[in-house]
Amino acid sequence: MNLDFASVWEMISDIVPENDALICGDEIISWKDYDLQSSKIATALKNAGLGPNSKAGLYLNNSNEYLIGQNAIFKIGGVPINVNYRYVAEELIYLLDNSDSEAVFYHACYSSRIKEISGSLPNIKAWIEIADGTKSEFEDSLKFEELLDSCDPMERIHRDPNTIYMLYTGGTTGMPKGVMYKQGEFLVFLFRTLKAMGYDVPEDINNLEEQIHNFKKDNTFIKSLIGCPLMHGTGMWLGAFLPLLLGGTAVTSRNLGFDPDQMWTQVEDTRTTNIVIVGDAFAKPMLDALDRAEESGKPYDLSSVKVIISSGVMWSEEIKNGLLRHHDMMLMDTMGSTEGGMGSSVSTRDNPPKTAKFSINPGVIIIADDGEILEPGS
């Protein structure tokens, strides 16, 4: 596929410039401004000496700036590096060194840790700080807002679809490792996921521009609320990439803790169509909040919700049934890892859910401990 993330989003920004691209709390960024701000930050990265294949870390909480910074890295032909905001100094040094990062975006609340590690990372050319209401403790940084004011937007360029997209593992099976994909091939995987969810995706993805015009005419864009961190594959791939690749909206909250009532209120306020979570850890408190609201005589308005998507942790049959009792929607349970998606199951009121039962994706095989290839279900 001769496509890459930044070029797709540039095309979309030209078609629906006034539509919402990013929402975080009460801050709304249009597609026009998403492209413009990303282009200005891309200029800042180039001015710092970054270029094609340069790596840049995203040491950020969920925010519009996370997605703007990532797009800026894509625009220069670079490689964004997801950084776990829970890491301590030693882990941060390892990850940023292992990834060959040349720049780091970080929220001001992490500035003391940046100050602690900066001397151990001589290859970092730019530390870009994003204000979050906390006091900065690191002086040698570029300020995100000042860059938006001072930088001209970078001119659009042709990019290689074989440019790497990389996501680092969480480190649960050893030190974090970067899993690499060619952007063009990874986009094929993402569009297949959208097709499996029932979205009208053209057979030839290079005809995507025509499809975006159709979405515009019918006003059928996805609006996805991302309940989990963007630093992990579930939040980024299923929560942000899927809606943005079809000209939709990525909705986040700056709150670090999970508040189910705040989430359902945000669903009502933004008219969310999709919700992305991580199994029962999210779904159970979400169900409890719905039950409480119903018992109080003030149920949440779920009429806009079409699908809840989960990956990463078990999503039990009992909790799925409870959610379906409140609203008729699709529940999509996906099985995968940083290395790729392997299977999924879809539940509705007409197709009752089961716990941990999946249909494997095309191209997936099952291998026994002795190397023998097994038939699914055998």
Q: What kind of feature is each model-predicted range?
A:
Residues M1-L3, K135-T163:
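Flexible, low-complexity linker/hinge segments
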Residues E18-S63, L67-N71, V88-I93:
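Conserved AMP-binding/adenylate-forming core of the ANL superfamily
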Residues S30-K32, I164-D204:
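Conserved AMP-binding A3 loop
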Residues N47-A48, K75-E146:
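Structural core segment of the AMP-binding/adenylate-forming
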Residues S150-Y168, G174-M175, H213-K223:
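Conserved pre-ATP/AMP-binding loop-to-beta segment of ANL
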Residues L187-G227, M231-V276, A289, A293-E294:
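Conserved AMP-binding/adenylation subdomain of ANL enzymes
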Residues L246-G248, T272-I277, L287-P353, G363-I365:
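Gly/Ser/Thr-rich phosphate-binding loop
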Residues I365-S378:
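Conserved beta-loop-beta connector loops within the AMP-binding
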